[in-house]
Amino acid sequence: MIIMDYLKILEDLVKIRTDNRIGVKKAFKYLSNLFNNLGIKNTIIEGCFVAYKEKENFDLILNSHIDTVKIQSNFKKDDNNFYGTGVIDAKGNVVLMIHAFLNSNNSLLVISPDEETESNGIYNFCQYLRNKNKIQRGIKCIVGEPTDLNVCIGHKGRFEYIVESFGEARHASSQGLNPIEILSRVILDLKNLPLEKIKVDKIYSSSITPTIIKGGIQSNIIPDYAYVLFDVRSVEKDIIKKIDDFLSQKNYSKHIKSSLNPERHYANFYMLENKELINKLSKHFKISFFNATCEAYYFNKFLKADTIIYGVGKLELAHSKEEYLNLNDFDRGIKEVEKLAELMIE
């Protein structure tokens, strides 16, 4: 077993601000120096940091992401906890994956550069592996995210769904087609659209939530255009088609246009279907479902990899000023992730 000062590595990584591309490059340089000092090969492929012992021979991919959301709080620590943006989402879990990699023979470590934004890194990396025919049948993957040390066998899909509405600009005292009023009807109608639910350890539901709305240029002018962006989370397949079909039946349908925000890739709803693997893992770990979205979907879609999500930290603390990592949980995660990696490929 390789002995590492994981708390020092984690502190160093959290102190590198990675809510921007320059910071991500600095963090990857830090990781490269770390592995170079260990005599372990590493490189950058499609923007992802990759460490490997045998580049052509691996049956387990260990993944997490180095980027964070915009900084909510700076790093600090006490005897019990580390605090600050990134300690659980996901640099603490980067360190867990590093430990699993160092203590397994046939694994590949892949760290994403942009999971919180476009997901271009993993999207392109998975296609790179597929196109190079570098994937063995039956490959497995662990994605490091804050799951409170539960093994999550799936995650929600996420989409940015835009509805644009159109009318004619005119004086606010006149009557007629108002794009803002149209969008208010769209929002209320979608709130009443029946959505699916699933049960894993508890009930998880799809959701359609308006998060951005824009329109208008002056208080006394009815605008000719407005739009609303919905954050769509799914525990069902084809939810976008479901929304499209629903809106197409409304009497305002000829005055709206709907589409996905084209500026990013989207991870759809994912659920592990390997019942034998689930049963094996359930003997050692609590089985749950990741109530957000992550990049596990891409490993399954492009590489046909049986993928689970595992890591330290409570999901509800991520992206908040209250983000913290309990050090006892971190120690437990270090021990458990090594066992989890063994179970995935035995």
Curated annotation (Swiss-Prot):
Q: Which domain of life is it from?
A: Archaea
Q: Where does Zn(2+) 2 bind?
A: D89, E116, H319
Q: Which InterPro entries match?
A: Bact_exopeptidase_dim_dom, Peptidase_M20, Peptidase_M20_dimer, Peptidase_M20A
Cofactor binding, per record: Binds 2 Zn(2+) or Co(2+) ions per subunit.
Cofactor(s) recorded for this entry are: Zn(2+); Co(2+)
Q: Extract the GO molecular function terms from the UniProt entry.
A: hydrolase activity; metal ion binding
List of catalytic residues:
D67, E115
Q: Which residues bind Zn(2+) 1 per the record?
A: H65, D89, E145
Top-level EC class as recorded in UniProt: hydrolase
Keyword tags: Cobalt, Hydrolase, Metal-binding, Zinc
Q: What is its EC number?
A: 3.-.-.-
**Matching PANTHER family, A to Z?**
ACETYLORNITHINE DEACETYLASE, PEPTIDASE M20 DIMERISATION DOMAIN-CONTAINING PROTEIN
The record's comment on protein family reads: Belongs to the peptidase M20A family.
* Identification of the protein by name: Uncharacterized metallohydrolase MJ1497
Q: Which organism is it from?
A: Methanocaldococcus jannaschii (strain ATCC 43067 / DSM 2661 / JAL-1 / JCM 10045 / NBRC 100440) (Methanococcus jannaschii)
